[in-house]
Amino acid sequence: MSAQPVDIQIFGRSLRVNCPPDQRDALNQAADDLNQRLQDLKERTRVTNTEQLVFIAALNISYELAQEKAKTRDYAASMEQRIRMLQQTIEQALLERGRITEKTNQNFE
């Protein structure tokens, strides 16, 4: 699928971007989210310069992305540790079962 031009509105400005057809809804949702963020920033900060608002929003989004990446790394590390613990538990159980089986077999001989 090739990208097709899509017109979106960002803070009152029209912008044409190329987007694959199957990602058009996601693009529109992202544009809506950005518009809402810019509007909220404008109200909270009383900054009226659109360029400045865009930079502040970009910094906020970059910070949020960095936070989410850190959470993902922490979660992945936690899952790796849990998997290692489960593997050790399973290996230990199999070893113990093997020992019990060996003892049982020796008793029957």
From Swiss-Prot:
InterPro entries: Cell_div_ZapA-like, Cell_div_ZapA-like_sf, Cell_div_ZapA_eubact, Cell_div_ZapA_N. The keyword Plastid does not apply. It is found in: Cytoplasm. Keywords: Cell cycle, Cell division, Coiled coil, Cytoplasm, Septation. GO terms for cellular component: cell division site; cell septum; cytosol; plasma membrane. Residues 21-100 form a coiled coil. GO terms for biological process: division septum assembly; FtsZ-dependent cytokinesis; septin ring assembly. It comes from the Bacteria. Its main location: cytoplasm. Homodimer. Interacts with FtsZ. PANTHER family: CELL DIVISION PROTEIN ZAPA. Activator of cell division through the inhibition of FtsZ GTPase activity, therefore promoting FtsZ assembly into bundles of protofilaments necessary for the formation of the division Z ring. It is recruited early at mid-cell but it is not essential for cell division. Belongs to the ZapA family. Type 1 subfamily. This is Cell division protein ZapA. It comes from Shigella dysenteriae serotype 1 (strain Sd197). The lineage of its organism: Bacteria, Pseudomonadati, Pseudomonadota, Gammaproteobacteria, Enterobacterales.
